[in-house]
Amino acid sequence: MEDCKMCMVPQIQLDVNHMMSATLGERGISEQEVAALRDAAEKAYENVRAHRGQGWLGWTELPYNQEAVIADIEKTAAEVRKQFDTFVVLGIGGSALGPIAVQQALNHLHYNELPAEKRGGPRFYVEDNIDPERMAALFDVIDVKTTCFNVITKSGGTAETMSQYLIFTDALKKAVGDDWAKHIITTTGADRGNLIKLTRENGFKHFIVPDGVGGRYSEMCPVGLFPAAVCGINIRAMLKGAACMDKRCQSGDVWQNPALMEAVLQYIATERGMNVQAVMPYADSLKYMADWFCQLWAESLGKNVTRDGKPCNVGQTPTKALGVTDQHSQLQLYTEGPYDKVITMIKVGAFRSTVEIPHGCEEFHDVAFLGGKTLNQLIEAERQGTEYALLKAGRMSQTITLPCVNAGTIGQLMYFFELTTAYEGELLNIDAFNQPGVEESKVASYAVLGNEAEKYRAKQEEMAKRPALSDKYIF
C-alpha cells in the first residue's frame, strides 16, 4: 500500500478479488459486466463532480473549506475539557452514529472507565434513543453540574432530541440556576428551526451545520468534529484523510476511482439478486462504523421512485456483523443460506496493541498449537478462514484494509463510503439525499401524540380510517 502524502499514513485499500469471476467463478462479476456499465459510471461520476459543493452535495467540500470553523471547534473543545467532567451528545441518526463510530475507532475501547488523567478528556455519552430506562440510567451516572450537553439537530424540530433538550435543561435549571445555559452547546442550522431560535434567546455557544450537508453525511462538519475534538481526536487529520480519498476518486474510470468501482460492483451485485450487504469489521474499534454505514446506505438508497417519477423500490439492505464474534452467529447463513448477500470485511493491517498467547495445555494439541502466537495473528487467520469459506461456497465478498486505525484512515474510510453512496444513487437514478419514508413515520408519530398543527390533524384523520385490528390475530 502506498503512503498518502496528504494524511501521512498509508492509503486504505479496496480488494474486490472475491467479487470477480476471475476468482469466484460463474457467481462472480466479469470484467465485461463492469465494462458494460462504463458509460453509466462515467455519467454518475460527472453528475457528482458537476454539483460538488452545491445542493445536497455540500459535504464534498468539507475536507477543504472549514479552517475558521476548525479553529473555533478546537478552542471550544479545549474549554470543555477544562470545565467539565462529562460530555453528552443529544442527537439521533447521523447526529449520533458518526460521533459514536469515531469515538469507538479512535479512543481507548474502555475510554469512560479510564482515570481522568489517562482519558485526557471528559467522559463521553451519546443519547441516541428515547428509552425512558436509558434516560434514567444516564442520570444515575452523571452529575449535571459538571456536564456539558451538545444538542445536535439541524432542523431544530427533531422530537427525540428536543425532548431530551427539555429534560436536561429542566435538570440544569434546578441544579445550577442561572448558569444553566453555560452547560449547553448547540449544533444546528443557521437560519431556521426551533433550536437556532433557542440558541439566540439563551446565548448558547453554537456551531452551524452547513447548507447542503444532510445528517448522514455530516461527520466531517461540526456535527461530528466537535464531539471528536472534545475527546482529544485529531480532527485535522480526519479531514486530511477525507481529502486524500477525495483526490484518489477524481476520475470517471472505474479502474482509477475506488469509490466508483465499489458503486458499480454493488449495482451489478444487486441486479443479480444480492440484496443484502453485510459489513463485517474484524476489529472492535470499527464495530460502530458498520452502524454508521447502515444508515448511510439504507436511508440514501432505499427509495420507491426514480428522479423522473417512475416506481422503482430499490435499495440494497445493509446489515452489520463483527469479526470474529459473528462467525459464531451469522456465518452459517452467509455460507449456506440464500445467494443474496455481499460480505464486506474490514481488516486492520497493524493493530495498536499486540497480545501474545502463552504456551500451555501441552497435552491438548488443539489448544497447545496457539501458544507462542498472538491474538493479532489469530484474528487475521480467522478472517482469512472466513474469506476462504465464502469463496468455497461461491459467495461474493470483498475486503477493505486499513493499514492502521488512526484519524487519517478513518477520514479516508468514511469519505469513501459517502462518495460510493452518492455514485450508487446516480446509477440507480434516485435521490440519495432525501428520506420521505422517514418523514411519513415522523408525521404519524406526532399525530399520535396529538400535535395540533394542521398537517398532524389531517394525519390523525387519515390514520383513523385504517382497518380495525382483529383480536383473532393477537396471541
Locations of regions flagged by a protein language model:
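Active-site phosphate/pyrophosphate-binding segments
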Residues: 175-344, 349-352, 437-475
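Gly-rich Lys/Arg/Thr-decorated short loops/hinges at beta-loop-alpha junctions or inter-strand turns
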Residues: 51-61, 117-122, 311-312
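Helicase-primase coupling helices
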Residues: 313, 319-406
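Short beta-alpha connecting loops at secondary-structure transitions
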Residues: 122, 205-212, 315, 367-372, ...
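Glycine-rich phosphate/diphosphate-binding loops that line cofactor/substrate pockets in enzymes
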Residues: 51-52, 72-85, 138-147, 264-275, ...
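C-terminal helical cap and adjacent loop that interface with cofactors, partners, or active-site loops
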Residues: 386-449
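Extended, charge-enriched "interface" segments that sit outside catalytic cores
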Residues: 2-81, 359-365, 369, 427, ...
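Glycine-rich phosphate-binding loops that contact phosphosugars or nucleotide phosphates
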Residues: 78-252, 443, 447
